[in-house]
């Protein structure tokens, strides 16, 4: 497995693969890899001849410097896992190489229709940071296919719109959420949980399932459903952060024509901000 840290060497290797006619898959990550990431890798391997995994803790995605500083950086362990899973290349650049002019002078890619709603309303600039780094990685790696987890549902929708709007010839694949046996969605941030908090954490999924069942049975008093769900989260020990029920395709409020809903949840448990989502088929 190749480990490349500079842009010129990455371009050189990508050019070589292109000359050989190889199909390239990209799995963008911020490192601290877990089995959910490995599922993305395994999916990517079925879709391409070579798989590139990027590991870059993107400063543009963090509102608070302390959150950026404490984000786990485990490059050696990550590379060992990726070697075992047959990855061809790890791209692990420094921030100074990705943003040589500094963050203030950086050119941004924005998807305004999706970057300022829902989670984006409370995290200004976050999704602009996502679309900027993903666009840059697309330009550098020039993948035929890129795999993203469905756990970050709004992010996936934003990337799909960016690809469509910008004319990228890239197949965007959403890979289903990977869960622990007790239902907790796998996340790098689960490492922030204490032992006691880890026992509580699966309640997020169970509470979301109960909400999904009510929607599937035809309940449509959205404000009441959300208020009840928030109360259940608080009773379980969470601090609710974001809670939405939206049209799964447009991310806009449900209408009589909506065929599928998406429940988007984010809640704090101790120092960990846990997110999850679930799609629900709506029957008229």
Swiss-Prot record:
An annotated Gene Ontology molecular function: pantoate-beta-alanine ligase activity
Binding positions (ATP): 30-37, 149-152, 178, 186-189
Active-site positions on this chain: 37 (proton donor)
Gene3D superfamilies associated with the record: HUPs (3.40.50.620), Pantoate-beta-alanine ligase, C-terminal domain (3.30.1300.10)
Enzyme class at the top of the EC tree: ligase
CDD domains hit by this protein: PanC
Gene Ontology BP terms: pantothenate biosynthetic process
Pathway in which this enzyme or protein is active: Cofactor biosynthesis; (R)-pantothenate biosynthesis; (R)-pantothenate from (R)-pantoate and beta-alanine: step 1/1
Record's keyword terms, sorted: ATP-binding, Cytoplasm, Ligase, Nucleotide-binding, Pantothenate biosynthesis
A cellular component term, taken from the record's GO annotations: cytosol
Binding site for beta-alanine: 61
Residues holding (R)-pantoate: 61, 155
UniProt catalytic activity: (R)-pantoate + beta-alanine + ATP = (R)-pantothenate + AMP + diphosphate + H(+)
EC numbers: 6.3.2.1
InterPro entries for this protein: Pantoate_ligase, Pantoate_ligase_C, Rossmann-like_a/b/a_fold
One Pfam entry name: Pantoate_ligase
Subunit structure and binding partners: Homodimer.
Family indicated by similarity: Belongs to the pantothenate synthetase family.
Extra remark beyond the main annotation: The reaction proceeds by a bi uni uni bi ping pong mechanism.
Function: Catalyzes the condensation of pantoate with beta-alanine in an ATP-dependent reaction via a pantoyl-adenylate intermediate.
Protein name according to UniProt: Pantothenate synthetase
Gene this chain is encoded by: panC
């Amino acid at each position: 497995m190749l480990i490349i840290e500079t842009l010129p060497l990455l371009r050189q290797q990508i050019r070589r693969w292109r000359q050989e006619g190889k199909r390239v898959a990209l799995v963008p990550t911020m490192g601290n890899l877990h089995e959910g990431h490995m599922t993305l890798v395994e999916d990517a391997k079925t879709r391409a001849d070579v798989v590139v995994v990027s590991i870059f803790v993107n400063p543009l995605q963090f509102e608070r410097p302390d959150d950026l500083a404490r984000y786990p950086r485990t490059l050696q362990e990550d590379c060992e896992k990726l070697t075992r899973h047959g990855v061809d290349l790890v791209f692990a650049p420094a921030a100074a190489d990705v943003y040589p002019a500094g963050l203030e002078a950086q050119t941004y890619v924005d998807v305004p229709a999706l970057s300022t709603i829902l989670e984006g309303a409370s995290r200004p600039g976050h999704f602009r940071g996502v679309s900027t780094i993903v666009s840059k990685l697309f330009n550098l790696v020039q993948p035929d296919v890129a795999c993203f987890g469905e756990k970050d549902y709004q992010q996936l929708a934003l990337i799909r719109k960016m690809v469509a709007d910008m004319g990228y010839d890239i197949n965007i694949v959403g890979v289903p959420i990977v869960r622990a046996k007790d239902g907790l969605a796998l996340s790098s941030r689960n490492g922030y949980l204490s032992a006691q908090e880890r026992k509580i954490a699966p309640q997020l999924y169970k509470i979301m399932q109960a909400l999904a069942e009510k929607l599937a049975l035809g309940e449509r008093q959205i404000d009441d459903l959300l208020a009840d769900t928030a109360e259940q989260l608080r009773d379980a020990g969470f601090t609710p952060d974001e809670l939405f029920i939206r049209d799964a395709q447009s991310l806009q409020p449900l209408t009589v024509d909506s065929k599928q809903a998406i429940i988007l949840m984010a809640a704090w448990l101790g120092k960990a901000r846990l997110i999850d989502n679930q799609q629900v088929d709506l029957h008229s």
